[in-house]
Amino acid sequence: MTYRCLLPMVLLLCFSTTALSRSYSLLRFQQRRSAEVCQKLLGQLHSTPQHCLEAKMDFQVPEEMNQAQQFRKEDAILVIYEMLQQIFNILTRDFSSTGWSETIIEDLLVELYGQMNRLQPIQKEIMQEQNFTMGDTTVLHLKKYYFNLVQYLESKEYNRCAWTVVRVQILTNFSFLMRLTASLRD
């Protein structure tokens, strides 16, 4: 008796997971809300004097990021996922010189992780289907961009001014993320 009920339950669970993973409207809502929380948390981090921003470098955000409306949903998912993953990795580095609240950073990391968790099933589906065009080249450009941010932090020995510059870059990234998220429609 138990086995007869088990098969329909497993099938229902598999179907609902697939159906949920492709519900872009729900995903858009969840991602937008979470990105707003991340922006708010980043805004709560103590800033340093204005002179730190004068030392900023031109990190050259990939050109494609200025054309978010041209991304297909699948490409947008790949790009959003990559950006979140890279931001997460940066924020797990040594920020002790900043005086930032560890609680705020932990909350930020939890939000980022939650966003990546929601995106991962769709991201995996897209990668398996190899159903991407613009996203794959943009991801390569993003990796270079984030590599440059990490190199900058390392060259400045993770000092407070370097973190201020990177924090501003990450805040700018969330503007891009919001635009990309807005393009997710069923």
Swiss-Prot record:
- Entry annotated with the keyword Secreted: yes
What residues are glycosylation sites in this protein? Answer: N131, N173
A molecular-function term among this protein's GO annotations? type I interferon receptor binding
Key word Signal present: yes
SMART domains on file: IFabd (SM00076)
The superkingdom listed in its UniProt entry is: Eukaryota
Q: Where in the cell is it found?
A: Secreted
**Which PROSITE patterns has this protein been placed in?**
INTERFERON_A_B_D
Pfam families attached to this UniProt entry = Interferon (PF00143)
Report the sequence similarity comment from the record: Belongs to the alpha/beta interferon family.
**Role according to the record:** Has antiviral, antibacterial and anticancer activities.
Q: How does it assemble?
A: Monomer.
Write the protein's name. Interferon beta-3
